[in-house]
């Protein structure tokens, strides 16, 4: 089975870094892009400070894409991304996540922005594995 190409929204936060750990060497997913804000966009992922106690995972060298770029959907599509894991704040997620979903990406979000919206499932591992 070919791995599904995925991206993470958010580059420097703890949730993003936990996602990076979980996606490194995953049997189903290949992390090919990380999108960040003005403080991280354009930087190599390896240059961004690591906050977790566990060691930084070994990932391909990724340059952080600018999440505010109006062509972010096109950039992700060109990379072959079909799945996006979002670790961005709710106030940013409200604008970015619907745009990505409308462009055909499957979006899995940690943000609270859409937790109570009909038609958007809430995934809780202990309840719906």
Question: Predicted segment positions?
Answer:
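N-terminal Rossmann-like NAD(P) cofactor-binding subdomain of oxidoreductases
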Residues: 1-129
């Amino acid at each position: 089975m070919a791995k599904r190409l995925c991206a993470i929204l958010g580059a420097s936060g703890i949730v993003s870094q936990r996602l990076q750990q979980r996606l490194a060497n995953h049997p189903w997913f290949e992390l090919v892009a990380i999108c960040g804000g003005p403080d991280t966009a354009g930087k190599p992922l390896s240059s961004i400070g690591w906050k977790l106690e566990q060691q930084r995972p070994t990932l391909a060298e990724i340059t952080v894409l600018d999440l505010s770029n109006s062509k972010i959907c096109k950039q992700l599509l060109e990379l072959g991304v079909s799945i996006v894991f979002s670790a961005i704040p709710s106030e940013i997620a409200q604008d970015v996540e619907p745009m990505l979903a409308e462009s055909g990406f499957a979006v899995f979000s940690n943000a609270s922005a859409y937790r109570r919206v009909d038609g958007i499932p809430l995934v809780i591992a202990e309840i719906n594995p």
